[in-house]
Amino acid sequence: MHNKTLHLALAITLGSGISPMLFAAVANDANPEPAATQNSHFDSKGKAPSSYTIEAQNAVRKTLPFADNRDFEEARKGFIAAPSYNKIMAEAGNVAWNMGSYDFLLGGKDYDSINPSLQRQAVLNMAFGLYEVVPEKIYQVRGFDLANITFIKGDTGWIVFDTLMSKETAKAALDFINEKLGKRPVVAIVISHSHADHFGGVRGLVDEADVRSGKIPLIAPTGFMEHAVAENVYAGNAMTRRAFFQYGVMLPHSPYGHVDMAIGKNASLGNMGLIEPNRYIEKDFESLTIDGVEMEFQSTPGTEAPAEMNTWFPQFKAFWAAENIVGTIHNIYTLRGALVRDPLVWSKNINNALYRYGQQADVMFASHSWPRWGNERIQDVMRAQRDAYANLNNAVLHAANQGVTINEIQNVYKLPESLKNNWATHSYHGSEEHNSRAVINRYLGYWDANPATLMPLSPKDSAPLYMEMMGGADKIMVKGKSLFDQGKYREAYEILNKLVYAEPQNTQAKDLLADVYEQVGYQKESAGVRNSFLAAAYELRHGMPKGVPPKPTGPDMIRAMSTELWLEYLGIALDGSKVADQHLVLNLRTPDNGEQFVVELSNSTLTTIKGQQAKKADLTITLDRSDLEGVMARKTSFAQLVAAGKATFEGDHKPFERLMAAITPFTPTFELLPGTQQ
C-alpha cells in the first residue's frame, strides 16, 4: 500500500451516512490493496482471529436466525440481468467503481475475521444489476454505487429516484437499463434527501439547461439545497479526517479489512455534481402526477437527513421509503461526526407511513438495500424498525432518568430480545453502543455530572501520570499482553491507550494496541465500528496515510454554498492570534444577486450579518457573486479580480490583506492517534 500513489481529493463535507467525495482517498483503483490472497492477511503485522474471537463469532452463528432466508429471496427477486463488467471508469481516468473487489464474499466461506451477522449483510449488499420491483413499471439498478438508482416507467420516459453519487455510475446505470429494456429519455428526477450518494450523479442523467428551463422537473424536499452543502461545512475538515476511520478508506477489500458499508458496498470515486431543483415539496403531504405516474410525497425532516421525503405510488400500491427504512438500523450519531439525529422523530415518521401507506402497500422499496414484498412482510419490517428507534430513545432515557450516564449507557442498553431475532433491526450502520450514547448526548450533553470529567486533563497530559502509577511501560506491556492473551480486549486497550499517549514513539506498545483493536474490529457487527477499529490498527502500525495536497471544491458545490455560509466558514478558518490587535469593518456587496453583508473583525473574531451595510466601513468590496465563486474555490484572488476590473475596493485594503493572510487552509492531515504522524 505504501508504494502506491495516494490521491487525496478534498471537497466540502456534504453530510450523509457517508462522507461523500469530501475525502476520496484511493490508490490506482477503488481498492487500495488487491484482495487476491484472501486466506492471508494483507498486512505483514496483521493477526488472524484469536480463539476468543472465533468463539465470539461461533456464538453469533448459534444465536441469530440464519435459517431465515427471506432477505436473500427478496434481494434476488426480480433480477433481470447483470452487466458484463464490474468496473466503472471515472472521467479522470481512475476506477470510479469496482464491484469485483468484493468477490471474495461470494465464495460461501464463513470468515472468522468478520462478524457473521455483518458478513450476511455484506453478501446481501452484493446485488449487482437490473431488478424489476413492480412488473413493467418500477425498476432498480443495484450495486453500481453505494445507493440504488430507481427508474419509474412513465408514459414517455423514465422518472428517476435518486441519482447515485457520481456522474459516471449514474450514466452507466441509465445506459444499462436502456440497453436491457429499450431506450427511454429521463423525463423527471426526484431526489429523496440531501446526501450526496443520492444527488451527486445528476449530471450523468440530464443536462442542467433542461432543468433550468423547466423541461425536466427536478424535485426535492424543501431545505434540500441548504442542507446538501451546509450540514457539515463548519467541521468539514475534522469530519473528513475522521471519515478515514468510519469508512475504512485505507483498508483493502478483504476478510481482514473492508467488507461493507452497511447500506451498500462503498462510495464511488467519480465526478460528483449538484443541480438546483426546480420544484420543492413543502407540505407534509403533497401529490403530483408526472408522465402519468401518481405520487404522494411524505415529508420526513429530521430523520435520516435534515431534508428527506418518502413517496407513495397509489397506482402500484408501492411505498418508497427513501433512506428511512432500509436493511439496517441507521446511525443516530455518525462516527465521522455530525449533529445527533432524533430516533423518536424517526420512529414517528415510520409510524405515520405505516398507518398511511403500509397497511395497503404491496411492495416497499428504498434508496438502499432490497425491496420487501407482501403486506404482512412490509408491516412487520416497518413496525420492527419503528419500535427499534423508539426503544432506543425511550429505554436510554429510562436509564438516564435513573442515573445511568453517557459513560455507562453503552454497557447498559440492549435491544429487546424480540427485536434481535428480526434481521431488519440489526445495527450495521449504527451500533447499540454509540447510538445509545448519542441519545444521552442529545438530551443531556456530554457531561456525566461528575466534576472530575467536566474539565479533565488532555489524554497526553494524564497518560504519564497513569503510567507512573502503574509502574512504567514494561509493567503496562506485560499486563496488556496478559489481557490480550485472555481475550479481555476492552480492558487491554484501556491501559495500552494510556501507554501510547505517554510514549507515542513506543512501537511495541502501538503494535500491541493495534493487535487489540484488530480483534475488536473482527468481532463487531457494525461496519462503521469495525472499520474504525481496523483503520486505527493500521495507522498504529504504519502511520497516517500520505498524499498530494487536497484538490479544490467542485464548481457545483461552490455555487450551492451561500455567501453567508462561506463568510461564516472564514470565521472558523481565521487564526485569531494573528490578528489579535486588529479591528476591521468591511462592507461586501454582490450586485448580481442583490446581497450585501457587514463583516467585522474584532477581539480576534470574525462576525457576519446579512442584509446590512455599515455607515463607516473601513473597506467596501463590490463584486458579482459569480466572480466571488472563484475566490471561494481558491481559483483566483480578490487582488486578481480587482486587476481584471471585476471587483472594486473602496477604502484601506491593507487590514483586509492581513485578515486574509490569517485564514488557515485546513487539510485533513492531523493525527487521530498519537505517534502516527509520519
Residue ranges and their predicted role:
Residues S482, K488-E494, K498-Y501, Q505-T507, ...:
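Feature captures hydrophobic
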Residues V133, G157-W158, M165-K167, G182, I219, M225-T300, ...:
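Metallo-beta-lactamase
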Residues M1-A27:
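Gram-negative bacterial Sec-dependent N-terminal signal peptides
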Residues P34-Q57, A318, T328, L344-E408, ...:
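Divalent-metal (often Zn2+) His-rich catalytic cores of metallo-beta-lactamase-fold enzymes
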Residues T156-G157, K167-I219:
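Active-site metal-binding motif and surrounding structural segment of the metallo-beta-lactamase
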Residues V123-R184, M309-F313, K317-E323:
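Conserved beta-strand hairpin/beta-sheet module of binuclear metal-dependent hydrolase folds
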Residues A463-I495:
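Alpha-helical segment of the N-proximal tetratricopeptide repeat
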